Amino acid sequence: MSRTTSSNTPTLPQAVQERGSLRTLEKGESQFIGSSSGIYFVNTVRRAFINANSRLSSRLLDTAHPTPEECIVADGEDEQQRPDVDASLLPSSFSYGHGIPTGLGRPPQPDVAKQLFMTYFQTWHRFFPFLHGPTILRDMEDLYSSLDENSRASEPIPPRVPTTLPKVVILQCIFNLASLHNSSQLPVASEIQKPTDLLSYLPGLAVKGDLVSIQALFAAGLLLVARMSLRAASVVSGLLSRAVFLAGLHRCPCRYGKLTADECDIRKRLFWCIYVFDRYLSQALGHPLGIQDSDVDVCPLDGPELHHPLLYPTVPSSYSGVASPFSGLSAMSVDATITGRQSEAGLGRATSEDESSQKHNRHSSLSFQVQYSRLLGRALELFHKSLHIRSIDSGSILSLQTDINALWNALPSSLQEFDPSSCDTTDRNQSQVFNESAHFILLHSQLVLLIHRPRLSLEPSTPEFQSAIQICINEAREIIKITSKQINAGYALFWPAYLSVTWMAGIVLAFACQLRLYSAEKGKREIGMCLDVLLHMSERWKLAKNCHAVLSDLAEAIQEMEHTAKRPAFEVSDSTFDSVHSGRDSVSSAMNYQSDSRKRARLDTESNPRSSQRNDGSGQPLNQIPADIVNVSMGEPLGSSFEPLDATDAAIEDDIQYFGDPGRLSSWESGMPDLLAGITWESLLGGINEDDPSWDSAFF
């Protein structure tokens, strides 16, 4: 690891330099996964287990075994889970009419459509309110009211009133998203079969600049994310970022007097949904941010509003007799918005705190997600920029940690505590599929993991690693506990980030157990819970099967490690150990080295009977046990295992167990008599020919 020093800016003692992964494929294709996805840390853990377990090494290096990249992004997952079916050949009573691609599917029966519509607004809309409910409801009613169900035509019934492509995309994405969490079976003819069925129609929408087209783009991206088609979703995210700038959504709409209050509200909601979407994909794939904070001046949904109309306060166009596409808002919400705008212009005051509070509560989930996404973006910019400009100083890290803690402390208590037993099961099943408190607890834990995870690729002997691993263990346990509770309570694990953060939590615990920095008994139990969660997630996402397979192998390796460590020392064969695992934090003063006379002092068994090291900067022990007593192997430091992995490298088995203090040597010798009783280092070394050039390397 390189070290970064500066005379002016305090820097980390160890440079944190996580890197991404680039794969080259056939026909000139290549795929990049950046370091923020966790790919570098996963490879670090993989190498640590391979070096410690030869049998696990053969499995992990098997080409049939999921690679780290295949546990982060499953290429073509959506196509593999859904058959290639032409919707035009499937039986269906309705169609969207001429000019609408059949690949988008056909409208379901009215009763199914109504149920799916309500499910969507009870679930996804709570977290991503990018649609204006009354408007999209009117579009759906217009569609079905124009379908002549009494028609005797052999072809599917088209609507009497033609509908547009953006509206069809929105409706179809709503139906497909809701079908993931609804008992109503969406007909195969109504499903969007593959991401390519969407992508080919979206570029034309990106250049239009109207809100409905941008909403259709976002709806398509949300469906792709829900199906774990992250690469395709990233393409849509790129279109969205350009569409945002073309339409001016990155500028606060309240600055412009020609926009109505209703339009300002929906433009804000749409922009912040796209912002959260961009931050998630940037972290999940390790890609650069699509929208920079420095380019945005949109005020938060929950205020304060910092901008004024340029001339006069905006009055909704419905008041002037002109139809507004957003006139379906309730009178209370419209009045509250108008009053707020008038107050900013100095022409009036808010009429009621209750109205303001109601608006705040309606968008509270999105508002808190935006705040977390801002911090997520800062973390990505700090730890995962290009290596040649990456600068990580302790002040920036401390500032980010402070803001993360401040945001967590600012959350309402209802979003900080997840207790499924306190919820009414009947009410929950009727109105809730997702749990908001669990969602924000997981968001917070994921963010804490993200800023501490880079230090887990440092040498384990460093204080930075020791501190980070304990913090990550705590967050990993919380993540596994929350996801398990959600499953047991019947909540849907809807957001794909739940998969990556749950798997990462299991990897952290496995890594800690492998290093003897966490109780193996507790670790095995919690990793087992994590495997159960991943198995549950695999019913929806193929990617979870890959994660489950890899974590299962690591859990098996931990089990083998514990089995070996519990055997009596006299049963351990010479081939089991090759050297003593170096103690990282042993007291260096246990043995003094006299360079002028090469005399060694007697080991002080009272003050430190097991640990004796020389503080020469290497951190390696001097008093290794002679090979004729026990033959054990020196496990290579993790720092040296960061080099590119060679499949031909020898796997080193490391089965020494720590108890509490990772710096102590294991207690393997506790079950056998003290063979060194009464023997001094002088007597042991007295028979060695110090003139022999192989003497020093043979023992030290």
UniProtKB/Swiss-Prot annotation:
Biased-composition ranges, Basic and acidic residues, are 596-607
Record bears the keyword 4Fe-4S: no
Major subcellular location class: nucleus
State the UniProt keywords alphabetically: DNA-binding, Metal-binding, Nucleus, Transcription, Transcription regulation
Which portions of the sequence form the region Disordered?
343-364, 577-624
Superkingdom, taxonomy of origin: Eukaryota
The record ties this protein, via PANTHER family, to:
MISCELLANEOUS ZN(II)2CYS6 TRANSCRIPTION FACTOR (EUROFUNG), TRANSCRIPTION FACTOR PDR1
Protein purpose: Probable transcrition factor; part of the gene cluster that mediates the biosynthesis of the mycotoxin fusaproliferin (FUP) that belongs to the class of bicyclic sesterterpenoids.
Protein name, UniProt field: Probable transcription factor FUP6
To which species is this protein native? Fusarium proliferatum (strain ET1)
Gene this protein is translated from: FUP6
